[in-house]
Amino acid sequence: MWDPLLNEFPDSVHGLRCMLAIKYLQLVEETYEPNTLGHDLIRDLISVIRARDYAEANRRYTNVKPALEVSSKTELRQPVYQPCCCPHCPRHQASIMDLQAHVSKAADVQNVQKP
């Protein structure tokens, strides 16, 4: 977390608010799995806050707002099944489909037969 005693304060109150909002959203982002809709929307909100000018922030927000309004709480935790083409996306770093559905993991069990 950002330590105000070790780092410089932003030049304006707006900068301080944006910095605190980004730090909060980063903490919320950690509660979502990387391949979920909620994670993607949090990343989009962070990009809205990080926009340098009002027009860019407004354009980004108008793209994010409809997705936020139509998404239910359960949809935010569900995996995203849309194909993604960005190389830095966390969805490309880990594969969900590593194991087949019918294969179960075996556990070592001690021999419990009586002699």
UniProtKB/Swiss-Prot annotation:
For this protein, the record's InterPro entries field holds: Gemini_V2, WCCH
The name under which this protein is listed is: Protein V2
Write one Pfam family the protein is assigned to.
WCCH
Keyword S-adenosyl-L-methionine assigned to the entry: answer is: no
Q: Which UniProt keywords apply?
A: Host cytoplasm, Host-virus interaction, Inhibition of host innate immune response by virus, Suppressor of RNA silencing, Viral immunoevasion
Organism expressing this protein natively: Tomato yellow leaf curl Sardinia virus (isolate Spain-2)
Iron-sulfur as a keyword of this entry, yes or no, is no
* Listed GO biological process terms: negative regulation of gene silencing by regulatory ncRNA; symbiont-mediated suppression of host innate immune response
